[in-house]
Amino acid sequence: MQSLTLQPISRINGTINLPGSKSVSNRALLLAAFAKGTTRLTNLLDSDDIRYMLNALTALDIPYRLSADRTVCEVEGRSGNITGKSGLELFLGNAGTAMRPLAAALCLGDNEIVLTGEPRMKERPIGHLVDALRQGGAKIDYIEQENYPPLHIKGGFSGGKVTVDGSVSSQFLTALLMAAPLAVNNTEIHIQGDLVSKPYIDITLALMKSFGVTVENHQYQVFYIRGRQQYLSPGQYLVEGDASSASYFLAAAAIKGGIVRVTGIGKNSLQGDTKFANVLEQMGATIRWGDDFVECERGTLTGIDMDMNAIPDAAMTIATTALFAQGETVIRNIYNWRVKETDRLNAMATELRKVGAEVEEGLDYIRVIPPEKIQHAEIETYNDHRVAMCFSLVALSNTPVTILDPGCTAKTFPDYFNQLKKLSEYTT
């Protein structure tokens, strides 16, 4: 296995232009495929998850043209359902942002299609989405294990009243919302349990609106969507920078700034993970906002105790930032860390202990007490891009850190370690 040892960083300073958001990129690609007209997507993320979606569009005979650097994509929309040939098998890696929305989208047709992925994808639950799609008439079979991919989809979703459990993943609701306008009947979606990651639903609703479709949202409990609608291409769509990816650079500035300015997101961003900057501010950093940037300056950091259900991906960065804060930090209401690319609660607790932290891992929370001195460790990354990027922050101590399988950042940010190095100053 490859490894990368990061030497201690004495100071972080400069400007970073963010790659496009994974969440926005894959939603925009699918809506562009549904839409009437050609859509030019700019600042598209080039990463593994996006490539899986693009490969799926190719297999589904949706024409698109990609720029040489893969950040501009012109998609010729289908003016409705995307069906694909019967007997097609789509391999979607470990890309939840492709698997869940495509599962719903392909239920609108009547062809038989198999959706599968990497071994970890087969451990990520999809039963709540399948249950909801079946309530709307969809015919779906589990090929291996009940409630998990791979799926055998036979179409049949026609809308109606459906109930979906919102407590595990907001992607299930996102998938239903994006497919529902193309169903033959109106759809009424009722949410069971507490809806996690609400800001990701706001991203979905905002994107649908950009493509000409509105949804009645009754306090995130009931959603009403008219059937037989048509998505309309906005012509051009700029994908904002990835706010989750911004978290590492902002946290680095809070710990060892200098000042870091992150461009591509700003005070009016769609993404809930921009609220990560507010958490850093509560911990003691100085934050400044612009229309298309956020800036962080070093402060004396103190631990916090906070519900971070709304920003689950960026909350991981707080767990490693806690190593540099005074007092303990508790991150609460994050059960859905357990059903991401790996069991992130267990992974973060295990690796934080390696560098010397005292950690309590609960069912849906993590408590971190920083060590007096951070220890050098080899960090297992569990093929999880965010674990790798979170633990790069350990290099902001006086101790090196070794990241195993650093290439796993290709899922969302292939160039991450180079970008971090550009902002880093080292004591010689």
Swiss-Prot record:
<dbReference type="GO" id="GO:0009073">
    <property type="term" value="P:aromatic amino acid family biosynthetic process"/>
</dbReference>
<feature type="binding site">
    <location>
        <position position="171"/>
    </location>
    <ligand>
        <name>phosphoenolpyruvate</name>
    </ligand>
</feature>
<dbReference type="GO" id="GO:0009423">
    <property type="term" value="P:chorismate biosynthetic process"/>
</dbReference>
<dbReference type="GO" id="GO:0008652">
    <property type="term" value="P:amino acid biosynthetic process"/>
</dbReference>
<dbReference type="InterPro" id="IPR036968">
    <property type="entry name" value="Enolpyruvate_Tfrase_sf"/>
</dbReference>
<dbReference type="InterPro" id="IPR006264">
    <property type="entry name" value="EPSP_synthase"/>
</dbReference>
<feature type="binding site">
    <location>
        <position position="340"/>
    </location>
    <ligand>
        <name>3-phosphoshikimate</name>
    </ligand>
</feature>
<comment type="pathway">
    <text>Metabolic intermediate biosynthesis; chorismate biosynthesis; chorismate from D-erythrose 4-phosphate and phosphoenolpyruvate: step 6/7.</text>
</comment>
<feature type="binding site">
    <location>
        <position position="23"/>
    </location>
    <ligand>
        <name>3-phosphoshikimate</name>
    </ligand>
</feature>
<protein>
    <recommendedName>
        <fullName>3-phosphoshikimate 1-carboxyvinyltransferase</fullName>
        <ecNumber>2.5.1.19</ecNumber>
    </recommendedName>
</protein>
<feature type="binding site">
    <location>
        <position position="344"/>
    </location>
    <ligand>
        <name>phosphoenolpyruvate</name>
    </ligand>
</feature>
<dbReference type="Pfam" id="PF00275">
    <property type="entry name" value="EPSP_synthase"/>
</dbReference>
<keyword id="KW-0808">Transferase</keyword>
<comment type="subunit">
    <text>Monomer.</text>
</comment>
<feature type="binding site">
    <location>
        <position position="313"/>
    </location>
    <ligand>
        <name>3-phosphoshikimate</name>
    </ligand>
</feature>
<dbReference type="GO" id="GO:0005737">
    <property type="term" value="C:cytoplasm"/>
</dbReference>
<feature type="binding site">
    <location>
        <position position="411"/>
    </location>
    <ligand>
        <name>phosphoenolpyruvate</name>
    </ligand>
</feature>
<feature type="binding site">
    <location>
        <position position="169"/>
    </location>
    <ligand>
        <name>3-phosphoshikimate</name>
    </ligand>
</feature>
<feature type="binding site">
    <location>
        <position position="171"/>
    </location>
    <ligand>
        <name>3-phosphoshikimate</name>
    </ligand>
</feature>
<feature type="binding site">
    <location>
        <position position="197"/>
    </location>
    <ligand>
        <name>3-phosphoshikimate</name>
    </ligand>
</feature>
<feature type="binding site">
    <location>
        <position position="22"/>
    </location>
    <ligand>
        <name>phosphoenolpyruvate</name>
    </ligand>
</feature>
<feature type="binding site">
    <location>
        <position position="336"/>
    </location>
    <ligand>
        <name>3-phosphoshikimate</name>
    </ligand>
</feature>
<feature type="binding site">
    <location>
        <position position="386"/>
    </location>
    <ligand>
        <name>phosphoenolpyruvate</name>
    </ligand>
</feature>
<dbReference type="InterPro" id="IPR013792">
    <property type="entry name" value="RNA3'P_cycl/enolpyr_Trfase_a/b"/>
</dbReference>
<keyword id="KW-0057">Aromatic amino acid biosynthesis</keyword>
<feature type="binding site">
    <location>
        <position position="27"/>
    </location>
    <ligand>
        <name>3-phosphoshikimate</name>
    </ligand>
</feature>
<dbReference type="GO" id="GO:0003866">
    <property type="term" value="F:3-phosphoshikimate 1-carboxyvinyltransferase activity"/>
</dbReference>
<dbReference type="InterPro" id="IPR001986">
    <property type="entry name" value="Enolpyruvate_Tfrase_dom"/>
</dbReference>
<comment type="function">
    <text>Catalyzes the transfer of the enolpyruvyl moiety of phosphoenolpyruvate (PEP) to the 5-hydroxyl of shikimate-3-phosphate (S3P) to produce enolpyruvyl shikimate-3-phosphate and inorganic phosphate.</text>
</comment>
<feature type="binding site">
    <location>
        <position position="96"/>
    </location>
    <ligand>
        <name>phosphoenolpyruvate</name>
    </ligand>
</feature>
<feature type="binding site">
    <location>
        <position position="124"/>
    </location>
    <ligand>
        <name>phosphoenolpyruvate</name>
    </ligand>
</feature>
<keyword id="KW-0028">Amino-acid biosynthesis</keyword>
<feature type="binding site">
    <location>
        <position position="170"/>
    </location>
    <ligand>
        <name>3-phosphoshikimate</name>
    </ligand>
</feature>
<feature type="binding site">
    <location>
        <position position="22"/>
    </location>
    <ligand>
        <name>3-phosphoshikimate</name>
    </ligand>
</feature>
<dbReference type="InterPro" id="IPR023193">
    <property type="entry name" value="EPSP_synthase_CS"/>
</dbReference>
<keyword id="KW-0963">Cytoplasm</keyword>
<feature type="active site" description="Proton acceptor">
    <location>
        <position position="313"/>
    </location>
</feature>
<comment type="similarity">
    <text>Belongs to the EPSP synthase family.</text>
</comment>
